[in-house]
């Protein structure tokens, strides 16, 4: 096995980044600007995981500019991210992408997208700015301490005989995705939280094809309000994704109770003033028509004047306290995972492992995951910047 020592630049450091995803590539871009010799390792196509983000439009960030308020959108990592976001905020993200040649706009829901509405375009802009970064299409098998640096053993993805290659680096940045294998770190005593699906649709015991595709706007679960989509397997959409993130480590089955119309409804008054209307026509002002029969059955077809107090209360209970039993997640839908390197192992001011000098961790490699809306990419950009700053300051 040939041992290749990467040439040190004027900075006195040469850096390996393992994982050519969002965080790894941006970290490489920032480090090359500082004059470092940077090598990216990934067995697949760089930035391939960026392509499906934001429905293919690439939701770069969220227009939340206070770092503490921004951090509230991460079920795992909120306090850890205070320091990170105070150093690299949403403002900094906009400036970064302007520098990369990516123009942006903010939607009414505060999500920030490229004006091209194309993740492919963003990918191309980032890669075009990595002119001085070497990209190795190799799978890293092992990292070992070697003198004052690190030895990386990797297998070329294109090699039929799987010949092992060895490299020497002064610094290593772990920026792999949450679905990746952490076995290459087995020589280091690091606590790693096994990945679980996050931001994923939920399979429920209660299923009905007749309501598949129905969306309830601004439904509420335990103080969280967002749109809820009913599907053939259960529930999906923004509210379901938030719940899946919060409850990523809960055991199945578990129950959820939804308020489908959080605003108070004076149903008795509506029944009294519309005595000859069917109940479904009265309720359709508050919830989608296609959901009413599923919730209350044949009561939907009864005239308002025939509804007694007990039936009225039953209707209200279905509107304000719909109970669903979650039995699993929708396999193959997840794009984000809960899990990764335990945050107790990381210095939040530098992204460096506390036990091992000159090894840094960023992005989804960390046990950090956020809600839908650009939050996970914000974590990728911000932690990449903090790692770059730490290496620059101490090199």
How does the language model describe each region?
Residues 1-12:
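A short, basic/flexible loop-to-alpha-helix module at the beginning of a structural domain
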Residues 10-23:
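Beta1/beta-strand and adjacent pyrophosphate-binding region of the FAD-binding site
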Residues 16, 32-55:
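Glycine-rich FAD pyrophosphate-binding loop
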Residues 21-22, 45, 179, 366:
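Residue-level detector of alpha-helix initiation sites
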Residues 48-131, 139, 288:
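Conserved N-terminal/central alpha/beta ligand/cofactor-binding core
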Residues 66-68, 86, 92-110, 171-175, ...:
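Residue-level recognition of phosphate/Mg2+-coordinating polar/acidic sites
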Residues 120-121, 126-288:
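Predominantly flavin-linked oxidoreductase catalytic cores and closely associated redox partners
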Residues 176-183, 367-394:
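A conserved FAD-binding loop/helix module that cradles the flavin
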């Amino acid at each position: 096995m040939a041992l290749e020592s990467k040439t040190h630049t004027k900075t006195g450091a040469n850096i390996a980044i393992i994982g050519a995803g969002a965080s790894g590539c941006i970290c490489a871009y920032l480090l090359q600007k500082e004059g470092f010799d940077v090598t990216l390792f990934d067995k697949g196509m760089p930035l391939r995981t960026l392509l499906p983000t934001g429905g293919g439009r690439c939701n770069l960030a969220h227009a939340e500019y206070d770092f503490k308020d921004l951090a509230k959108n991460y079920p795992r990592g909120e306090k850890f991210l205070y320091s990170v976001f105070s150093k690299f905020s949403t403002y900094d993200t906009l400036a970064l992408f302007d520098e990369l040649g990516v123009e942006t706009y903010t939607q009414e829901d505060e999500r920030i997208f490229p004006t091209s509405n194309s993740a492919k375009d963003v990918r191309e802009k980032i890669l075009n700015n990595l002119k001085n970064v070497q990209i190795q299409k190799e799978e890293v098998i092992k990292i070992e301490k070697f003198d004052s640096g690190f030895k990386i053993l990797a297998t070329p993805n294109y090699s039929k005989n799987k010949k092992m290659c060895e490299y020497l680096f002064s610094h290593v940045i772990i920026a792999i995705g949450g679905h990746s294998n952490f076995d290459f770190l087995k020589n280091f005593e690091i606590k790693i939280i096994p990945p679980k699906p996050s931001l994923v649709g939920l399979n429920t015991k209660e299923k009905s094809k007749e309501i598949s595709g129905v969306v309830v706007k601004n439904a509420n679960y335990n103080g969280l309000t967002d749109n809820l989509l009913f599907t053939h397997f259960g529930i999906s959409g923004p509210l379901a994704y938030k719940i899946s993130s919060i409850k990523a480590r809960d055991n199945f089955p578990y129950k959820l109770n939804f308020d489908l119309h959080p605003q108070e409804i004076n149903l008795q008054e509506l029944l009294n003033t519309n005595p000859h209307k069917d109940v479904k026509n009265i309720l359709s002002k508050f919830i989608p028509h296609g959901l009413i029969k599923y919730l209350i059955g044949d009561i939907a077809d009864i005239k308002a004047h025939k509804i007694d107090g007990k039936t009225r209360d039953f209707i209200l209970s279905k509107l304000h306290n719909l109970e669903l039993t979650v039995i699993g997640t929708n396999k193959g839908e997840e794009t984000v995972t809960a899990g990764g390197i335990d945050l107790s192992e990381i210095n939040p001011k530098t992204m460096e492992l506390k036990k091992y000098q000159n090894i840094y961790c960023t992005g989804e490699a960390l046990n950090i995951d956020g809600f839908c809306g650009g939050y996970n990419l914000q974590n990728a950009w911000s932690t990449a910047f903090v790692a770059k700053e730490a290496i620059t300051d101490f090199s």
